Amino acid sequence: SPAFNSWG
């Protein structure tokens, strides 16, 4: 998830 990480 973009809200949690930069790759997913």
Swiss-Prot record:
Disulfide feature: none
One Gene Ontology term from the biological process aspect of the record: neuropeptide signaling pathway
Alphabetically ordered keywords of this record: Amidation, Neuropeptide, Secreted
Principal location class: secreted
Stored InterPro entries: Kinin_peptide
Glycine amide modifications at: G8
Compartment(s) of residence: Secreted
Pfam families associated with the record: Kinin (PF08260)
Entry GO CC: extracellular region
Family of the protein in this entry: Belongs to the kinin family.
Function in brief: Mediates visceral muscle contractile activity (myotropic activity).
Protein name: Kinin-5
Organism expressing this protein natively: Periplaneta americana (American cockroach)
